[in-house]
Amino acid sequence: MERILYQVFPSDTNYSYDPPAVTAPSQGSSQTDFGKVVIALVVILVSVGVFYLAYTLFLKDCILLFKAKKQRTTTEIGFGQTPARNQDHPGP
């Protein structure tokens, strides 16, 4: 009977493991461009919505308050420019 010797690792090979290169299926440029457009539209719509809600809930009141402090009374806001009141003859 013959004795067979097995060589487990070849002597001339590098023993480090190099995984095979896997190429991912590349998406078409039109799909990536469409995705960027969708993201841009979503960001724009959300920012416009936030600004609209901020204006209706908060900023409009702040603008009216600023105008009221600048003028004499809050009733003068809707009537535009009113003449200055004379301090010598106060009104009724």
Curated annotation (Swiss-Prot):
Name the family: Belongs to the mastrevirus movement protein family.
Chain segments annotated as transmembrane: 38-58
Outcome reported for the amino acid change (mutating T56S): In strain: Mild
Annotated localization: Host membrane
Bilayer topology reads: Single-pass membrane protein
- In the UniProt record, which is one GO cellular component term? membrane
Q: Which residues form the signal peptide?
A: none
Give the function comment from the record.
Answer: Involved in the viral transport within, and between cells.
Listed A to Z, the keywords are: Host membrane, Membrane, Transmembrane, Transmembrane helix, Transport, Viral movement protein
Quaternary structure, from the entry: Interacts with the capsid protein (CP). Part of a MP-CP-viral DNA complex.
Official protein name in the record: Movement protein
Lineage top rank: taxon: Viruses
Gene Ontology terms: biological process:
transport of virus in host, cell to cell
Organismal lineage: Viruses, Monodnaviria, Shotokuvirae, Cressdnaviricota, Repensiviricetes
